[in-house]
């Protein structure tokens, strides 16, 4: 298995500098990761630098709380795509999900999917650490109904990250035709292999180089 092609090489810390982001971009070129996952402010830089390379440009929408308005998320998506993003990882409205407002949650996702249609993959971050199992299932079902390409466990900025149990539940819920992304706390090759075995088709990590080289000592967190 080519683990590198399953990894979104990630740098989302608020204090990331241009030098930090360039390092991630160069590593993505060298190791041929699936994508770089960066904050929207770095999308144009990444798109320019990765032109001609088989590495997607992934950014985050409504991140990390998911509490911006649907209109804002849709605008962020269009703006990111205009600057060169080919994948967007959006955060659901977690509070609305917990309120049982399925209509709002679905519309929130749907509007981002429509804004990205034909131009970028949409991954929906459900923030599993804040949800009950019933809420996780409902979030996945609403994501599929709204037309999302992937469901994703975590932002990496809340109280917990991906677990193999959550990945298995998400995979069971969405079926074989929607992607499942594990992110948050995936720092070693063993972690990544566990997630893939549980059903993940993509892994978000900042310790991507250490994962590929199977070097636990090199693992760091840029979430």
From Swiss-Prot:
Among InterPro entries, the record links this protein to: Aldolase_TIM (IPR013785), DeoC (IPR011343), DeoC/FbaB/LacD_aldolase (IPR002915), DeoC_typeI (IPR028581)
Give compartment(s).
Cytoplasm
Entry's Gene Ontology molecular function annotations: deoxyribose-phosphate aldolase activity
Name-wise, this protein is Deoxyribose-phosphate aldolase
Active-site residue numbers: 89, 152, 181
EC number, UniProt record: 4.1.2.4
PANTHER family cross-referenced by the UniProt entry: DEOXYRIBOSE-PHOSPHATE ALDOLASE (PTHR10889:SF1)
- What is the species of this protein? Bacillus cereus (strain B4264)
